[in-house]
Structure formats: C-alpha cells, structure tokens
Amino acid sequence: MKALEIAKVEFGNIVRSNKFLAIVAIFTLMLLSGLCRVTEPSAATLGVPSATTHEVKSNEKLCVKVMEAIGYSVLILVPVVAVMLGFDVISGKVEKGIVRTLLAQPVFRDHIIVGTFVAGLTSLLVGVAMPLALSLSLAVLLLGITPSLADIALLVTYLGVVAVFALAYYALSVFFSTVTGNSVKSLAAGILVWLFSSFMLPSLSTAIIRLLLGPPKFEQVQMGQMVVIKTDSEYMRKFTDLQSKILSLTLDYHFRVIQDQLLLGPGIKDYTGLVVLIAFSLATLIASFTVFVKREVR
C-alpha cells in the first residue's frame, strides 16, 4: 500500500467522521454570525431612515467589508479547527493499534506518515475553505454587489493566507500528536498553546513591558485654550516595539499582521509573517516525520 493509497483511505475516513462534520458546521455558523454585522445599520445611517449600510458604503471594497466582518472569528476559530483535526492524527492510530497493523504488512513507515499528512492537510483545507467560500458567497448576495477583479483577487489572497495560518496550527498539533503518542495530552497541549497565544500572552506582554519601562509617562499639550494630557510619544514607541517583539513569538501575531495589511492596503507589502508561518509549518512537519520514522511502535 503506497502513501497515496493510505491518503485516500484516510481522507475518506476523516471527511465522513462526525467530528469533521461537527467542526465544519460550527465553523460555518460562527462565520455566518459574523457576516450578519455586514448588513447592520451603521452609526452614519441612523439619522437617515432611507439609507442602508450598502448605500452608504457602496464605495468601499467588498473584500474589506467581508474581511472586517469575519476577521476576528477567523483569528479565533481557525486554530481551534486545525487543532481538533490534528490532535489524534498519529496518536489515535497508535492507540488503536492501526500503526502496528499497517507495519505488519509490506508498508514503510514513511508511507504511513506521508499518507497521513496528505490526508490531514487536504481535509484541513476542505474544512476551512468550504465554510469561508460559503460565507463569502452569501456576503456577495447580502450586499448585492458584483465583486470586481480586484475584490476577487484580494479575497483569494485572504483565503490563501488563512490556509497557511491553519496549516501552521495543524502542523503544531500533528507534532504534539506524534511526540506524545497520546490523544488527550496532544489535545491539551494544542489547546494550551492556542489559549496562551490568543489570550494570555497579549495581557502578559503589557505587564512585562510595564516592568521594563515603568509606568506610562505623560506630557501636557496646549491646544488653544485647553491643555490636553497625552502619553509621551517616545514611551509609546518603545512600548509598541517591545509588544511587537513579544507577540511575534506567536503564530497569531504573524497572521494578524498580514490580515491588517490586506485590510488597510491593496495587498501584502511585508511578507515576513507569511514566510514565518510557512517555515514554521515545514519545520514542524519535518520534525514530526523524523520522530515517527525513528520511533518504535509497540
């Protein structure tokens, strides 16, 4: 049995599983709930009864509206989807004796791990791309706007960036699954990394910077007859630089930087974050491959 044959069997098992269907359904519902904000009346339209969000914002790019609506949901939920799909990729097979059964046949270890990787990555792309494609299609219908070529290009770029972000978390989850050989430990490790990156480190970074720089410094600025107290610009510059360096240790930060570039400009100007996510994914998958091939399965 070759790696491709293993991948086909694995992919079929994954997409037919209740876990996969439940994850895709929940992800889709969360994205759709985020898109509901696109059609809500904005503050600018409250005083104009006949105006709608579409009429007021008709000059804005469709892709920007959609990305703003689902951006937070994508940032929070995509790592969860990736972790849930990857935490038992290897450990589950070890626990169920599938790996031992396969190795009893004329199958090489590298065929097993490569086939599993291919099936997992394909199912991940399907699990992320399908809800996003459905959400984007509904957004076009809700807004009643025909997307331009620039809109389509930017949305496709965004889908690609989301896929790379998902791949990074999936690779990390597979690594935990391979190293621990235990699905519970693997899931716990993946969730802890996600919680630390998304919620804990941003708060901790502020406390760490306060310890390094001391309390905020303020300066008085004369504005006409009023005196305005503002935070010292040099202090804020150092604060922002240190925070960026600390948060750059997380995958979420690099995705958020790329997402902000797509929201603010016509495209990605700095590819550093994208390179980091791709390099991390490749390095982690290679590490998982090495550990699995060299480890004895009892």
Where are each of the predicted segments found?
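Hydrophobic/aromatic residues in alpha-helical transmembrane segments
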Residues: 82-86, 134, 171-172, 188, ...
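A structural motif at transmembrane helix-loop-helix junctions in multipass membrane proteins
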Residues: 17, 160-201, 206
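Terminal transmembrane helical anchor/hairpin motif
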Residues: 38-64, 192-195, 199-286
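Secretory targeting signals
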Residues: 26-40, 54-75, 114-181, 224-225, ...
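Aromatic- and glycine-rich beta-strand/loop motifs that create alpha-glucan
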Residues: 1-27, 293
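Membrane-interface capping segments at transmembrane-helix boundaries
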Residues: 39, 289-298
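Helix-loop-helix units of permease transmembrane domains in multi-pass membrane transporters
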Residues: 88-122
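Alpha-helical transmembrane segments of multi-pass membrane transport proteins
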Residues: 75-79, 91-92, 161-165, 280-281
